[in-house]
């Protein structure tokens, strides 16, 4: 095995890791804010990919140009999810919250299968296609642009949460919602904003991946699983931890499949998850 092949795997892992990081950041933001795990995160990613596909199929809008629309659609979906479901289970037991979001995932997937069937779809001849050759490394243009857009979005999210007034209000609500309400911060509004931003993240990731991934009703399952691992690895509620965790997962998946056995790629990732849960349950970075 040559060093060029290993370098190719590293580059591929880094690009996928940045996408995993943004997906996980949306999940982590929601959990850190409300301590509710969104088990429908993968289905929301699937909806974002289908949104890009149908905007291309019906209106000829290339996925890279439909990203703003996809973000708005998914943010609206997050607000609807909060006001019509989540706010009613905020004070419920954890088991009820898990069943509610898990049931939401089944509902969304079932509706998608009814409307669109489980067939595989793809965007034919997108604006981004082809590959770049840098030395001995080949980089697909759609993958490169998707990873860079996700990185920029991640940085924007982190700066928003840590530097803006609304972001600081989100952090205050996450730390102590009752104290935040005493200070005049409307927790219900913050929760809705958190859901909008969290699903906006999957809107960006899903919209970019629609350029080169097959789109089908179960497409979000593996991405959601990796997002859960990234959140656990980086620290529940830690946004910056998702970046490092996403990159680690991408590299483990890529290098593990190359150096050991590609059929066990998922095993390597979940082995890391188990080790983290057992030996460092708070994750590498803790909250925020």
Features from the language model and the residues they span:
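Transmembrane helix-bundle core of multi-pass membrane transporters
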Residues: 59, 88-163, 190-193, 255, ...
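Cytosolic-side transmembrane-helix boundaries in multi-pass membrane proteins
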Residues: 5, 115, 119, 175-189, ...
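Transmembrane alpha-helical segments in multi-pass inner-membrane proteins
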Residues: 20-22, 60-72, 195-273
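Short, non-helical or kinked segments that cap or interrupt transmembrane helices
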Residues: 27-49, 63, 91-96, 166-169, ...
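Alpha-helical transmembrane segments within multi-pass membrane transporters and channels
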Residues: 60-104, 111, 244-249, 280-281
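Membrane-embedded helix boundary and interhelical linker motif in transport proteins
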Residues: 11, 33-80, 84
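Helix-loop-helix "hairpin" substructures at the membrane interface of multi-pass membrane proteins
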Residues: 16-17, 138-216, 239-244
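Membrane-interfacial amphipathic/re-entrant helices at transmembrane-helix boundaries
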Residues: 1-22, 51, 62-66, 92-99, ...
């Amino acid at each position: 095995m040559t060093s060029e092949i290993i370098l190719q795997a590293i580059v591929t892992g880094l690009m996928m890791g940045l996408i995993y990081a943004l997906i996980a950041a949306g999940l982590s933001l929601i959990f850190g804010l409300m301590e509710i795990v969104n088990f429908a995160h993968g289905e929301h990613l699937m909806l974002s990919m289908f949104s890009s596909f149908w905007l291309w199929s019906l209106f000829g809008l290339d996925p890279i140009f439909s990203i703003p629309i996809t973000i708005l659609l998914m943010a609206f979906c997050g607000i609807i999810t909060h006001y019509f479901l989540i706010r009613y289970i905020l004070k419920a037991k954890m088991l009820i919250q898990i069943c509610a979001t898990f049931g939401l995932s089944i509902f969304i997937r079932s509706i998608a299968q009814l409307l669109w069937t489980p067939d595989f779809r793809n965007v034919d001849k997108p604006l981004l296609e082809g590959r770049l050759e840098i030395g001995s490394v080949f980089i697909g243009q759609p993958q490169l642009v998707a990873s860079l857009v996700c990185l920029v979005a991640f940085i924007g999210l982190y700066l928003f949460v840590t530097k803006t007034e609304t972001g600081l209000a989100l952090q205050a609500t996450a730390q102590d919602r009752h104290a935040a309400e005493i200070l005049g911060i409307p927790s219900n509004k913050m929760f809705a904003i958190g859901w909008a931003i969290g699903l906006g993240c999957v809107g960006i990731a899903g919209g970019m991946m629609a350029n080169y991934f097959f789109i089908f009703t179960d497409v979000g399952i593996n991405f959601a699983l990796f997002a859960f691992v990234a959140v656990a690895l980086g620290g529940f509620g830690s946004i910056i931890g998702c970046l490092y965790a996403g990159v680690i997962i991408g590299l483990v998946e890529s290098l593990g499949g190359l150096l050991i056995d590609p059929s066990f790629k998922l095993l390597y990732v979940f082995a890391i998850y188990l080790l983290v849960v057992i030996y460092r349950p708070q994750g590498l970075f803790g909250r925020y």
